[in-house]
Amino acid sequence: TGSNANLLSDELITHLTGRYNEIRLFPFSFEEYCRINNIDIVGQHTKAVGLRGHALNKYLMEGGFPETMDGAIDKTAYTKALLDTVIKKDICKRYKVRYPASLRQVADTVIDNFCQEINFENIRETYAIRSVQTVKNYVSYLNTAYLARILHKYSFKSVERQSNLKSYIID
C-alpha cells in the first residue's frame, strides 16, 4: 500500500467535481478471514469449532491484511513498514508534525496498550511532550489515519462515558 496523505480528509471533496462515492476499505473482518480460508463460520460440530478457534488465534496474532494472507510476505515486516509509511508519509506530512519521534512514541504506546484507557497526562510525562493537547492531537491523527479507532468507554452513565478514551487497533 502507498501513502494516502492527500486523501485523508474531506477537503479532498472540494477538489473533485461531479459525483463521487466514498469507499473505506478496512482489513478483513474475522468472518471474511474465515471465508477466504474456507473455514466454516456457522457449523457447531467439533471440527468446525476447533478450526474456528485455531483461525481466531491466528487472526488475532496476524491481523486481517489481505496482502499477508498467502504467506508470501513476512507479516511482521509488512505491518512495521505499513505503520512507518502511515506515520511518516500520511500523518507527519499532512499535519506538519515537528517532532516525529514523539508521534511515534505515542503511536507505539497506543498500539501496545490497545483496548485500555488512554491517559494523555501519563503519556505526556513519560515522553516529556510539552502539552497534553499535543498528545491528544497525535492520538487524533492516529484515528484520522485509520491506525486506531479512538472511542469513549461504553456506559449507561454519562460521567463514565466522559472518562478517558480507549483505543482499538485496526489490523
Label the predicted regions.
Residues 1-2:
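Conserved D-loop beta-strand region of ABC ATPase nucleotide-binding domains
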Residues 73-171:
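Accessory nucleic acid-recognition modules appended to NTPase machines
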Residues 5, 9-117:
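Interdomain motor-coupling "hinge/lid" segment immediately C-terminal to the ATP-binding subdomain
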